[in-house]
């Protein structure tokens, strides 16, 4: 991610779905007024979901996702369809594209019903209408209106109704829920200390995304941000004329930082703030006590929303399993997932421990949490789990009164 661009997780995600050769890629090019997607008469040109970050007026920053055809064939086709289905879990808006010259198929109607079942804001787009005479257009419109009034006859070739479609997409933009990282916890000129370890896993020349976002949120709310490594924390606190309003640490440094920061100073972590921002913190706190019941052989899934090169002291694959073994005095079986890969079937797991989800948009993070809940599998968070195992969970959520009540 460039430091000058909106993070992917903060963009409105628009998924483009439909059968092969429905005109999904040509529609994307028409909507964006750019040749972003490869267009071909050959079926199956798009073999994997393709993500395109851009500005789309009047929406603003968006992530457009071009998906493989949902009627793909063969073993590889089934895998491509599964990838397209995964995209449904992260979309804020879905466009179902139908080749108007072919008409609505039963598969199209089934997918539309699936979109409605997910309560996903959707538009039915009847593309290639330049191939139909007025009578056939009228008949197709009547059939489509039986499914939804939110349908458009468009032509990606002539740009017919493309502007109207863009306006309709903008009107479907999800109403933003006012969630804060920490802006509601501080006042102007409050001091916030950010503890950001620089170790072998840290990216070269920049802070990781949660640290960037929290730092920006402090500045946006007129706070005073002091950023240090764990090794300089004690000296930084000693030099401050006033105690900080809040200390935010990387979760993996929770144990050491909690010993340095006076008990009178509120302390939390980037991961906890990120889970709060994504709306999954309450369920993560309620789930963490499952660690008390872990036994030998229990399966624990540790899941990250991004993919990165694993280091020898990687938090997900090395440190967390080590802390869990030490805390539980047991030998559970650890499984791992990263990026877009998150199991559909979670029933085999005693517990899911998920990262803060900075690289996932709110809808996908909520989808993962809801999937776990539907299968009665507790899902907690890196920061919550680490704080709990270090005996400082109450302290780490004390700055968040609504969450702190869950531990009373």
Which positions does each model-derived feature cover?
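Conserved G1/Walker A P-loop phosphate-binding module
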Residues: 1-78, 86
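Canonical P-loop GTPase G-domain recognition
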Residues: 120-123, 128-184, 191-193, 222-231, ...
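Short, flexible loop segments at the rims of nucleotide/cofactor-binding pockets, characterized by
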Residues: 41, 71-76, 99-103, 171-173, ...
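C-terminal effector/interaction modules appended to NTPase cores
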Residues: 1-2, 11, 19-25, 204-408
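Long, well-ordered amphipathic alpha-helical subdomains in the mid-to-C-terminal portions
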Residues: 185-213
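Conserved C-terminal guanine-recognition region of P-loop GTPase G domains, centered on the G4
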Residues: 52-60, 79-151, 181-184, 207-223, ...
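Helical mechanochemical/support elements of P-loop NTPase systems and associated helical scaffolds
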Residues: 42, 46, 50, 80-90, ...
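G-domain G4 guanine-recognition motif of GTPases
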Residues: 67, 98-101, 120-136, 152-160, ...
